[in-house]
Amino acid sequence: MFGWEFPPFNSGGLGVACEGLSKALASSGVDLTFVLPFKIPISVPWCRFVFSNESTDLISENQMQRLFSGYQSHSIHSKSSKTQDNGLPDAVSGDLIERVRAYALRAGAIAKKNKHSVIHAHDWLTYPAGIEAKKVSGRPLVVHIHATEFDRSGDNINKEIYNIELEGFRKADMVVAVSGRTREKVIQKYGISPHKVKVVHNGVEFQKSVNPVLETFNRIKAGGNKIVLYA
């Protein structure tokens, strides 16, 4: 499984979803290896981690040019570049496309060294890595779409990210969308066959999540504040 972040080292919901899915798969008996683009001090009992920046086996420059020849060459920068309190670079700062590219360069070697039956890649950040892993092992590729570029940017999309998403959808054996609405966007905006796109909703761990949330709500209400719940 190729991810981009994992709690507590996450900047949004993607890492939380990856944590929940990996834990659920492991509880069903799946032997899971979770790959991240950079090393972080993390360990969980249900899966093992592989950090791509520890791999020294890279593909050649010619292979790199072939891999990204279909994409634009400009860089994507965030509005601000910052470092987390733990000293790790923010996952969304700096040249994001270069980070995605570097991740993909090492994915083939990781796939070669780690036995697996299926490849699972989360969002566009990991699709090139998943594609390279599939080229090496020939195993089925499942790409998970948590949010499309249209969800993030409306109609003012970044074409480079769109092209990476499109390539991932086309080369995947299955596309997993987090909702029916996301599935429809993949079908309509990217021209992907409806038979290829399945819906798997995000789950909730009630025992883990509800009590702390209720306690937080009670503290907010005790302070005289109003609560608006969006569902």
Regions found by a protein language model. Give the residues of each.
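A conserved catalytic-core segment of Leloir-type glycosyltransferases
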Residues: 24, 28-114
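Nucleotide-sugar donor phosphate/pyrophosphate-binding loop at the beta->alpha transition
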Residues: 99-106, 139-142, 150-167
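Conserved donor-binding/catalytic core segment of Leloir-type glycosyltransferases
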Residues: 176, 219-231
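A short, active-site helix/loop in glycosyltransferases that binds the activated sugar's phosphate group
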Residues: 162, 168-196, 206
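Acidic anion/phosphate-binding donor-loop and adjacent secondary structure
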Residues: 153-156, 187-188, 195-196, 204-219
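Active-site proximal beta-strand in glycosyltransferases
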Residues: 118-120, 127, 131-152, 176
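Carbohydrate-associated surface elements
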Residues: 38, 181, 203
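A short, glycine/small-residue-rich beta-strand->loop->alpha-helix junction that serves as a flexible
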Residues: 5-19, 42
